[in-house]
């Protein structure tokens, strides 16, 4: 028994090391790749100081943090709702953040500061997450809870579309492109949003014990002495915060929170002590690679990263649905 535990521990360490190396390679490639390839030896040249340190580095850090936040949010929501298909984008949380953002633009008539827009996006994400939690407490079946989340997402998407369609504001029309997801406008001025993600990310990665209990189910968690009401509300607040900040920073990006936790679980990383940091590393790596594709796929324009992740993630999602139905 002890030997099996040690083997599993060594395997987990190997996975985390491999994911760390993958993330570092993706980060290095992201800093080098662009309209002009800049190798590490040229990073401190006048050209490198502009393109690498002022343009690519803030974007790369934002992509890394958002990818980690979305993947961890997916893992947390799957444990909270006891639903392997739970994910911020699929369950409407990202769209809720978008509704909060657009409502702020409409009510503020484009005069609100960036920090106020970010807080409104966070509030929208929290409201949708709390509604989903209310549905979960009614002990709905997995399929019905999933459908409820999809319906909330459709409602939020319809509200955003109506608002943008009837708006004469140029800023609001530009939000439609922004809601497809993209890091094109990220620079050091958004560093406060990046900093807002770090403490919540680190805190959630340290909460493996309650997450493992929640993954066992509500009855088992109660029997083990876990205060469900406290942890549910705290984790809902943390998830809503991460998704809201991510949407405020880069728009709606789907499938990262769904696919990454599933793939890691299929690889044997079921313990949240390993799954949560693994999700952070894998989510950051996946979104960095998707951002590189979005930047380089077309010579004349940049693809919305939400389109790239949806194109790559949709087939994986269909495969997961088919596998879950067997």
Curated annotation (Swiss-Prot):
Gene3D superfamilies: ABC transporter involved in vitamin B12 uptake, BtuC
Transmembrane segments: 15-35, 61-81, 88-108, 112-132, 146-166, 184-204, 240-260, 274-294, 302-322
UniProt entry tagged with the keyword Calcium: no
Compartment list: Cell inner membrane
Domain of life per record: Bacteria
The entry's keywords: Cell inner membrane, Cell membrane, Membrane, Transmembrane, Transmembrane helix, Transport
Cysteines joined through disulfide linkages: none
Listed InterPro entries: ABC_BtuC-like (IPR037294), ABC_transptr_BtuC (IPR023691), ABC_transptr_permease_BtuC (IPR000522)
SUPFAM superfamilies, sorted: ABC transporter involved in vitamin B12 uptake, BtuC (SSF81345)
GO biological process: cobalamin transport
Keyword match Cell inner membrane: yes
One function term, GO molecular function aspect: vitamin transmembrane transporter activity
GO CC terms in record: plasma membrane
Membrane-topology annotation of the record: Multi-pass membrane protein
HAMAP family tied to this protein: BtuC
Subunit structure: The complex is composed of two ATP-binding proteins (BtuD), two transmembrane proteins (BtuC) and a solute-binding protein (BtuF).
Family, as annotated: Belongs to the binding-protein-dependent transport system permease family. FecCD subfamily.
UniProt function note: Part of the ABC transporter complex BtuCDF involved in vitamin B12 import. Involved in the translocation of the substrate across the membrane.
The name this protein goes by in its record: Vitamin B12 import system permease protein BtuC
Lineage start: Bacteria, Pseudomonadati, Pseudomonadota, Gammaproteobacteria, Enterobacterales
């Amino acid at each position: 028994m002890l030997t099996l535990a040690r083997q599993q521990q060594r395997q987990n360490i190997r996975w985390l090391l491999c994911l760390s190396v993958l993330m570092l390679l993706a980060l290095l490639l992201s800093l080098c790749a662009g309209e002009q390839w800049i190798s590490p030896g040229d990073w401190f040249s006048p050209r490198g100081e502009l393109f690498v340190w002022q343009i690519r580095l803030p974007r790369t850090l934002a992509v890394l943090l958002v990818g980690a936040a979305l993947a961890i949010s997916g893992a947390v929501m799957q444990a909270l709702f006891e639903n392997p298909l739970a994910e911020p984008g699929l369950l409407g949380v990202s769209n809720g953040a978008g509704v909060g953002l657009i409502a702020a633009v409409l009510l503020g008539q484009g005069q609100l500061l960036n920090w106020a827009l970010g807080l409104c996006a966070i509030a929208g994400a929290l409201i949708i997450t709390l509604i989903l939690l209310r549905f979960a407490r009614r002990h709905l079946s997995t399929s019905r809870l999933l459908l409820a989340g999809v319906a909330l997402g459709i409602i939020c998407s319809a509200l955003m579309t109506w608002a943008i369609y009837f708006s004469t504001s140029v800023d609001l029309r530009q939000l439609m492109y922004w809601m497809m997801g993209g890091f094109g406008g990220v620079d050091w001025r958004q560093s406060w949003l990046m900093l807002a993600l770090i403490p919540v990310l680190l805190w959630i990665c340290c909460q493996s014990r309650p997450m493992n209990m929640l993954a066992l189910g509500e009855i088992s968690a109660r029997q083990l002495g876990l205060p469900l009401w406290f942890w549910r509300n705290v984790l809902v607040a943390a998830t809503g915060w991460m998704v809201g900040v991510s949407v405020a920073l880069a728009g709606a990006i789907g499938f990262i929170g769904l696919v990454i936790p599933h793939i890691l679980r299929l690889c044997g990383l079921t313990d949240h002590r390993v799954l949560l940091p693994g999700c952070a590393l894998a989510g950051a790596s996946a979104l960095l690679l998707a951002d590189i594709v979005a930047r380089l796929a077309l010579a004349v324009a940049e693809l919305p990263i939400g389109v790239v992740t949806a194109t790559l993630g949709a087939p994986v999602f269909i495969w997961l649905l088919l596998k879950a139905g067997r």
